[in-house]
């Protein structure tokens, strides 16, 4: 019996005039956010499959590099990143963007690395929704509070203020590549302040050996594993193919350094459980890895060799069952995340695929491409076993 052909998208969203760089679903509403290389940010209705809003979020010369929505950010906010050195936080008003951004982070970063909103562990969609209602509890007694570990040079007073503030409200952090392309910076989206940089060094110190010779940081993931007592962790992928795992309680030295790729790491995704993830790069490898926070290790769980090199984007569904990659060969590849086996190769797009993302209810997947389209897919419903 022959294999069934891969499905077609349930809808194709057209309207962007240039390459669609990133895509993100609203945490609870039937809305999709997309950003393109000419600076346009569009909001789409995923039920009626039409655009409900369009705005020029960043300059046309620099474009939108990334967009993100999150239950931790709030129901009425999204953030965008441009190659103009800024990250902007927007209010969603009647389905459209606020005329002016609520907050602008002047990161002075003009690179290709997409930002990462902090990912906090959740075992169910209800936990994410409870955050917007002010709930501080998660299963197992963990809290949504994210604490900042200050280095020895930060005063005790500043440290106390940070921790008190974080306990009082659900602070949301974002990680970006810094003005120095080997460094990762963490910013507070409530205050607009830069909190810390990795690796941490004083002005009179020489370049940190942990990132020396690795080239630019090309991919980053910011997350808060349940074992960390609320302290942030960062995965950073570099130009030489290496991946560094950081615990900000020790901002000078990474917990571990591994080299899963032979070419630049272009995308990192951490599962909602924060105990592993998937990476892709400019080589012909897709790597699924485990994170052990008690030992500070990152180890390969599954390595997949591609016929054609190049992975621009990766995503793991919230339920941890499915993962997908966006390829240079115009293909979206879908995998069983738990077992590591291939499930489908989707061939709709006619140019490089830049990003892929799953809806919070696990029903939809969206793919973005240089062909200026966004495709919506319904694959492997969450209530069915694989």
Curated annotation (Swiss-Prot):
Expressing tissues: Expressed at low levels in floral buds, leaves, stems, roots, and siliques, highest levels being in siliques that contain developing seeds.
Principal location class: cytoplasm
Described purpose of this protein according to its UniProt entry: Involved in the formation of X-, Y-shaped and twinned plasmodesmata (PD), thus modelating PD size exclusion limit and regulating cell-to-cell transport. Cell cycle checkpoint regulator that monitors and responds to DNA damage such as DNA cross-links, and triggers the halt of the cell cycle progression in the presence of DNA cross-linking agents. Mediates the active process of aluminum- (Al) dependent root growth inhibition and thus is required for response to Al toxicity. Required for both early and late phases of embryo development as well as during seedling growth.
Family: Belongs to the plant DSE1 protein family.
Name by which UniProt lists this protein: Protein DECREASED SIZE EXCLUSION LIMIT 1
SMART domains associated with the record: WD40 (SM00320)
SUPFAM superfamilies assigned to the protein according to its UniProt record, in alphabetical order: WD40 repeat-like
Start-end of each WD repeat: 15-54, 62-100, 157-197, 213-256, 260-299, 306-347, 348-386
Gene Ontology CC entries for this record: Cul4-RING E3 ubiquitin ligase complex; cytoplasm; nucleus
Further facts: 'Tanmei' means short life in Japanese.
Protein's GO biological process: acquisition of desiccation tolerance in seed; DNA damage response; DNA integrity checkpoint signaling; embryo development ending in seed dormancy; plant ovule development; plasmodesma organization; plasmodesmata-mediated intercellular transport; pollen development
Taxonomic placement: Eukaryota, Viridiplantae, Streptophyta, Embryophyta, Tracheophyta
Recorded name of the encoding gene: DSE1
Signal peptide: none
Description of the deletion phenotype: Defects in both embryo and seedling development, and pale yellow seeds. Die as embryos, probably because of intolerance to desiccation and abnormal protein and lipid body accumulation in mature seeds, but immature mutant seeds can be germinated in culture and lead to short life seedlings defective in shoot and root development, with reduced hypocotyls elongation in the dark. Seedlings accumulate less anthocyanin, are intolerant to desiccation, form trichomes on cotyledons, and have reduced accumulation of storage proteins and lipids.
Transmembrane segments: none
Keywords: Cell cycle, Cytoplasm, Developmental protein, DNA damage, Nucleus, Repeat, WD repeat
Places the protein is found: Cytoplasm; Nucleus
